[in-house]
Amino acid sequence: MGRELQKRKKRSSRAKVQTHTIKKKVLNPQGSGIVAKAWNKKETLSQNYSRFGLVAKLGTAAGGMAKKSAAANYAGITKDDPLAVKSADRGLFEVREVKVERDASGKIVKVLRSDNPLNDPLNEIESDSESEEPKPKNPTHDIEWHGISDDRQEMIAQSSRPEVVRMLEEEASRPVEKTVRYQSERELEWLQRLVAKHGDDVAAMVRDIKLNPMQQTKGDITKRLRKAGLLQ
């Protein structure tokens, strides 16, 4: 049945909107001091890594990025047909400089036009070869250019890299100092007890359950003995 008072209540058909505050954990990188100094806490992980010139994930992005369509990629590319006949009239007059002859009063009498009105490049090459005299060879001009050298390319690549990447590469290229391992007194005592009981028989040392309870291998015991100077 139910209470009559509850039945008489006016229910609202509109649902109550509740906003939940999502507490995002602020990323605090602790792996590298270089990355921690350049980290911006107001940006996401992907934004920070893209600013550093690094990749946040080794795999491709599954989503969240706007993909360019094939039509957008080829929108700015115009394909020219080499066999197509193009009109010489472009709709606008081309402004260029010409030589003129003037009379005594300053009026233009004659316009000196070029011998190549169609701008044929072969005509210019032929006229240059006929008119010009052979010039003495300059050894500096005869040097063949083989492109940008590897050192120059490396310098350009280094200058275009972000500062964080350059500092990380410098840190990674530093030689790592090898840690020298010293044998403790207890280890030397254990090795001396093995030598006193078995001599040079390393195989017997491996099978000894009491003196070798940790089941050290033959190669490991041999290396320890040679390091201590107890085995030649």
From Swiss-Prot:
Cellular localization per UniProt: Nucleus, Nucleolus
Assigned keywords, A-Z: Nucleus, Ribonucleoprotein, Ribosome biogenesis, rRNA processing
An example Gene Ontology biological process: rRNA processing
Pfam family, one: Nop16
Basic and acidic residues: compositionally biased ranges: 132-154
Span list, region Disordered: 1-20, 113-161
Positions with biased composition (Basic residues): 1-14
GO cellular component terms given for this protein: nucleolus; preribosome, large subunit precursor
Main location: nucleus
Protein family according to the UniProt entry: Belongs to the NOP16 family.
Role summary: Involved in the biogenesis of the 60S ribosomal subunit.
Assembly behavior: Component of the pre-66S ribosomal particle.
Protein name as annotated: Nucleolar protein 16
Species of origin: Neurospora crassa (strain ATCC 24698 / 74-OR23-1A / CBS 708.71 / DSM 1257 / FGSC 987)
